[in-house]
From Swiss-Prot:
Pfam families for this protein: DYW_deaminase, E_motif, Eplus_motif, PPR, PPR_2
Location of region: Type E(+) motif: 634-664
Residue ranges of the TM segments: none
Region of interest called Type DYW motif, as start-end residue ranges on this chain: 665-752
GO CC terms in record: chloroplast
Superkingdom, natural source: Eukaryota
Gene: PCMP-H90
Region annotation (Type E motif) ranges: 558-633
Keyword Plastid found: yes
Protein known as: Pentatricopeptide repeat-containing protein At5g13270, chloroplastic
PPR repeats: 47-81, 82-116, 117-147, 148-182, 183-217, 218-248, 249-283, 284-318, 319-349, 350-384, 386-420, 421-451, 452-486, 487-522, 523-553
Length: 752
């Protein structure tokens, strides 16, 4: 009996380990043959049968590293490699898309087999096409002395997939002209390769040949034609063929429904589903996933729940292919509790499932839960995380202003090569910008080879949010000079920068040139930004005139921006008008009550102020609770108004009382509308006081405080005063921008 003895595992020092399909650092075949290191495998015979069986086994298990090393040992032992072994090896190279290995193997095959069969050469051809190396495939195709339907189908499909349609059509026409009758399987393969609108004409030609060949009754080909027309964007043709099908297979149904959904016709997809249910068409799990996506795009919660009931009845909700779309559906319908329940039913959640639930936490503003889930999953099964998951965590960290965790996640993503696309890098820029780490944001941006418009816009927005208006405008000009065309969101960022710096003329110029110079039509959002610029600058009459003359009816945000300016500049008359308009357009927005209340109390109109509070109570509205937080030694400390739950509460209030003697000085005057005791309880003051008692060293880092709402004027003055008295730099990020307090001054110059 032949025995194969394996002494030890193969040494990774001899042949680089293949870790993924993108591996390209592969030694030449000559270096493999000339290796002088001691063999790790000893072969006890030269008959070759067992050796080839072992080689086939390694190939089928996709262990190319070990297979190549074993080939070296077979060479040393004088054992030849069979054609079947080569076929299996090329199949492994094809599936792993390892072009470098495939080329080495092809060179070796040429040396070892004088006249390879057409079957073996087709394996090589398929490998080159799958690895998207048409140059190698073309060369081999021309060299082949014998061609069959598989050879031609492989090349035609490869040309079609890569958009080289003239060659695909030419080869297909030549095959027909030669009298060869294509097998039905060839049509199915060709139809799968036509995946974009440019291939539609070629697809119609194939459809015509199918009709001439009398293959219209072939269900697989009919399904292929339906899906081909969907992928090429001709839904009318797809529906026409679908309606003529005698037997409507689920694959054809789902293909058409996917086409409808992707084309923004989700309601047509649902109608098709309902019609086919009535006809008694059988369904599989993929059909349900497509229907749920259509329901999600329309936010059809009730219909989606009915689909869920069908899924549960069939026992499919534990399957990841159905459970994940269910989770996504409920999240998009803002039914997060149902999404969590659906997630818990999935037997083995995959990376898409986890990404969906973490993204759901972010959409529901449960950012801490998103980070907590990510950390837990990372420690248990890091391999299940994908680039979308990391992008969601970057978003969560940007809202939480947690630069420490954000930096750790960033490092982990780099280590695992999961930063992903430029979208992920743009999310990083936003995260670092909103955490107040512009140097890190700049480093990410500068590391990008060709930043797209999303990255440019994120970087400009970061500087606008930070209060660096001049830098934001400089970046905009640089972006344009690089040939990048700004989009609607880019102009929002530029106008925001102008607003935060009181740059009225620059804002007007930006709005005027949007359409004229850059062919970007301004929307109501851009006009609202301009209203904000006027209002912040105290140009309330100009703002009102602008609102009357703009091509849109003022919306709730228009009046909210105007009302905010009225409060900042204490214009009660215009503030009353703005408040009334805002309450009419959006009666649920508390700003329409709180800002007029502040104006009335400032003016001493107590009855009118009480009326505002009465309206809020009648409509069961509550002002959003102010919350501020600060990081110390990696831990986040949160404070709300009047907070007394912090372990260091006594020290915090004692620190605040140290400034009590200055509260009646010339620099800091409390508004008449609030008592001094109430001001002491404001969340940002509590956070600042905690920061002061936590600082260490002679040159401590700035005290960074983050707040969910706009900083109140009194606390803004308080922070300026503290920075002067203590010498500490204080940074506050509120809902609008960053404030840098140093030596009694703020970077915003009171534009906020």
């Amino acid at each position: 009996m032949t025995i194969l003895t394996v002494q030890s595992s193969f040494s990774s020092s001899r042949v680089p380990v293949i870790k993924n399909a993108n591996f390209d650092q592969i030694p030449s075949w000559v270096s493999l043959k000339s290796s002088t290191s001691s063999p790790s495998v000893k072969i006890s015979h030269k008959q070759g049968q067992v050796e080839n069986l072992h080689l086939v086994s390694l190939s089928k298990h996709r262990k190319l590293n070990e297979a190549f090393e074993f080939l070296q040992e077979m060479d040393k032992a004088g054992v030849s490699v069979s054609s079947y072994s080569y076929q299996c090896l090329f199949e492994a190279c094809r599936e792993l898309r390892s072009l470098s290995h495939g080329r080495l193997l092809h060179d070796r095959m040429r040396m070892g087999i004088e006249n390879p069969s057409v079957l073996l050469q087709n394996c090589v051809l398929q490998m080159y096409c799958e690895c998207r190396s048409l140059e190698d495939a073309d060369k081999l195709f021309d060299e082949m002395s014998e061609l069959n339907a598989v050879s031609r189908t492989t090349m035609i499909s490869a040309y079609a997939e890569q958009g080289i349609l003239d060659k695909a059509v030419g080869l297909f026409s030549g095959m027909l002209a030669s009298g060869d009758k294509p097998p039905s399987s060839m049509y199915t393969t060709l139809l799968k390769s036509l995946v974009n609108p440019r291939a539609l004409d070629f697809g119609r030609q194939i459809h015509a040949h199918v009709i001439r060949a009398g293959l219209c009754s072939n269900t697989s080909i009919e399904t292929g034609i339906v899906n081909m027309y969907v992928k090429c964007g001709w839904l009318v043709g797809a529906k026409r063929v679908f309606d003529q099908m005698a037997v409507k297979k689920p694959v054809a149904c789902t293909g058409l429904m996917v086409g409808y959904t992707q084309a923004g016709r989700a309601r047509d997809a649902l109608k098709l589903f309902v019609d086919l249910v009535t006809e008694g068409v059988e369904w599989d799990s993929f059909v349900f996933s497509v229907v749920l996506k259509a329901c999600a795009s329309l936010e059809e919660l009730n219909l989606g729940k009915q689909i869920h009931a069908c899924v549960a009845k069939l026992g499919l909700e534990s399957e990841v292919s159905v459970g994940t779309p269910l989770v996504d559906f409920y999240i998009k319908c803002s039914s997060f509790e149902s999404a969590c329940r659906a997630f818990q039913e999935i037997r083995e959640p995959n990376d898409v499932s986890w990404s969906a639930i973490i993204s759901g936490y972010c959409q529901m503003s449960q950012f801490e839960e998103a980070v907590k889930t990510f950390k837990s999953l990372r420690s248990k099964n890091a391999s299940i995380l994908n680039s979308f998951t990391y992008t969601s965590i970057f978003q969560a960290c940007s809202v939480l202003a947690d630069c420490n965790i954000g930096g750790q996640v960033h490092a982990d993503a780099i280590k695992r090569s999961l930063i992903g696309s430029q979208y992920g890098e743009s999310a990083l820029i936003t995260m670092y910008s909103k955490c107040g780490c512009l140097d890190d944001a700049n480093e990410v941006f500068e590391s990008m080879d060709n930043p797209d418009i999303v990255a440019w816009t994120a970087f400009i927005s970061g500087h606008a949010y930070y209060g660096n208006a001049s830098e934001a405008l400089r970046l905009f000009e640089k972006m344009v000079s690089c040939g990048m065309k700004p989009n609607s969101v880019t102009f929002i960022a530029v106008l925001t920068a102008c607003s935060h710096a009181g740059l009225v003329e620059q804002g007007k110029h930006c709005l005027d040139t949007m359409l004229r110079k850059y062919n970007v039509a301004p929307t109501i959002d851009h006009y609202d930004c301009m209203i904000d610029i006027y209002a912040r600058s105290g140009l309330l009459d100009e703002a009102l005139k602008f609102m009357k003359n703009m091509p849109f009816e003022p919306d709730a945000m228009s009046w909210k921006c105007f009302l905010s300016g009225c409060w900042t500049h204490k214009n009660l008359e215009l503030g009353e008008i703005a408040g009334e308009e805002l309450r009419q357009l959006d009666p649920e927005d508390t700003a329409g009550y709180v800002l007029p209340f502040n104006l009335y109390t400032w003016a001493g109109k107590w009855e009118e102020a009480a009326e505002m509070m009465k309206l809020m109570n009648e409509r069961m509205l509550k002002k959003e609770l102010s919350c501020s937080w600060i990081q110390e030694k990696g831990k986040i400390h949160r404070f709300i108004v009047g907070d007394k739950h912090h372990p260091q509460t006594q020290e915090i209030y004692e620190k605040l009382k140290e400034f009590d003697g200055f509260m009646e000085g010339d620099m800091f005057q409390c508004n008449m509308t609030e008592r001094r005791e109430q001001l002491l309880d404001h969340s940002e003051r509590l956070a600042i006081a905690f920061g002061l008692i936590s600082v260490h060293g002679n040159a401590p880092a700035p005290i960074k405080v983050f707040k969910n709402l706009r900083a109140c004027p009194d606390c803004h003055e308080f922070a300026k005063h503290v920075s002067l008295v203590t010498g500490h730099e204080i940074v506050i990020r509120d809902s609008r921008r960053f404030h840098h307090f140093k030596e009694g001054k703020c970077s915003c110059n009171d534009y906020w």
